[in-house]
Amino acid sequence: MSQQVIIFDTTLRDGEQALQASLSVKEKLQIALALERMGVDVMEVGFPVSSPGDFESVQTIARQVKNSRVCALARCVEKDIDVAAESLKVAEAFRIHTFIATSPMHIATKLRSTLDEVIERAVYMVKRARNYTDDVEFSCEDAGRTPIADLARVVEAAINAGATTINIPDTVGYTLPFEFSNIISGLYERVPNIDKAVISVHTHDDLGMAVGNALAAVQAGARQVEGTLNGIGERAGNCALEEVIMAIKLRQNLMNVHTRINHQEIWRTSQTVSQICNMPIPANKAVVGSGAFAHSSGIHQDGVLKNRENYEIMTPESIGLNQVQLNLTSRSGRAAVKHRMEEMGYHENDYNLDDLYDAFLKLADKKGQVFDYDLEALAFINKQQEEPEHFRLEYFSVQSGSNAMATASVKLACGEEIKAEAANGNGPVDAVYQAINRITDYDIELVKYQLGAKGHGKNALGQVDIVVSYNGRHFHGVGLTTDIVESSARAMINVLNNIWRAGEVEKELQRKAQNKEHNQETV
């Protein structure tokens, strides 16, 4: 009988560590809801003790996600576990994930401890976590470089202490599939109480082995796989969950396991993560890359035309990537747009129909026909703009030429006030940015400017993603229109609003902290 492999997504924890700019609470929630819709069993959404912002993100997601188990990370430290529990207590169901290093190198040089002390601390912290929940995961950091006898001792002790999931990470992506398989099978041979816990694996891609190691571990008995969408993560990244999921689906006859993932949501969830995290998907990326179903060889094209299965082991439709349709114009009504969004898998709470339809009409007037990928892009921008905006672009104009310095005039709404400025620059985008900087007077540094296209040919939308540095923090902004200069301006306005909102959040957190201190003093 086929057994279930639990899918544990850590895009919002391990994956976010690779980003140049931290995600906002709203952005994290948007990804979490997409993961829930895709059907992940467990989502690790943050490290609450690390910052007030991370605590708020975990708490917000824990409150709103209903169909996936929400998990938070904690070191084997009392405060970490207590704070994680506090952030998660509003969830329908939650898990605390605690970890400590077990390899000789980490124990000696990082922890400056001994294996016996590590086991003692792991046992104590697992028991502490069990005071808050009966779902506790324990990870042996750097398990891939831990002698199997030592690893077995730690695992047995953690299970006896109450851990219900034991995670075996290849933290530095060092092992090869046959080695990793031997580690898992070795634990099954050496740990007498191993049947009392789910064995999980968490693999990294430093040698390009993350997916191979995960699948080898499943064959050896692991029943939970941890990873991220699109494989994002520190260094070379994490195990790409979409690849593991589709490998299990397509080779189920060989592996005799299954997942509960809604495969039709894979492509859209992948795109959501890519857009929000500002991490483009390589064209040759397995499963979700733009070239995954493209055939350029004449022999291959001929074979596909005769029978798709000649060269396609899966269909675009199997991951929710349907054919582009050209059925929407400026004459299409609100109901038609709503119906098309529903056909693409969107729900009413995924976007504001009034705002989306207004944006659709403006785009349709410019382009004539609106494609599915246009609607996807508009829905993404629509979601980003749901948060309150302090800055709003009212108007801009640019003059430039091959032998003339670019000049830009910009008018912004700044709260209740309208301000305008003009500036010169090294090109139209720089001129617009100089004018915006004069109005807002934020001391920011542009760290990254990235221009991409949404769609195909001359009717593609221009997407601009930027990252700026402000007060030691990085902030991300995105703009999407048919005009790349306007997209650039809107990306900068998006960044400025993100900076402003971050400041408002900090003020609110300070106010709450002061009120808490005041209440304690008066007790």
From Swiss-Prot:
Cofactor list: Mn(2+)
The residue ranges of the Pyruvate carboxyltransferase domain are 5-267
Where is Mn(2+) annotated to bind? 14, 202, 204, 238
Matching PROSITE patterns = AIPM_HOMOCIT_SYNTH_1, AIPM_HOMOCIT_SYNTH_2, PYR_CT
Q: Which UniProt keywords apply?
A: Amino-acid biosynthesis, Branched-chain amino acid biosynthesis, Cytoplasm, Leucine biosynthesis, Manganese, Metal-binding, Transferase
Pathway where it operates? Amino-acid biosynthesis; L-leucine biosynthesis; L-leucine from 3-methyl-2-oxobutanoate: step 1/4
Its GO biological process annotations read: L-leucine biosynthetic process
Assign the protein's first listed, main location to one coarse class.
Answer: cytoplasm
Subcellular localization, as worded in the UniProt entry: Cytoplasm
Molecular function in Gene Ontology? 2-isopropylmalate synthase activity; acetyl-CoA C-acetyltransferase activity; manganese ion binding
Q: Name one Pfam family in it.
A: LeuA_dimer
UniProt lists the family membership as follows: Belongs to the alpha-IPM synthase/homocitrate synthase family. LeuA type 1 subfamily.
Q: What does this protein do?
A: Catalyzes the condensation of the acetyl group of acetyl-CoA with 3-methyl-2-oxobutanoate (2-ketoisovalerate) to form 3-carboxy-3-hydroxy-4-methylpentanoate (2-isopropylmalate).
Binding partners and assembly: Homodimer.
Kindly provide the name given to this protein in its UniProt entry: 2-isopropylmalate synthase
Please give the organism. Cronobacter sakazakii (strain ATCC BAA-894) (Enterobacter sakazakii)
What gene does this protein come from?
Answer: leuA
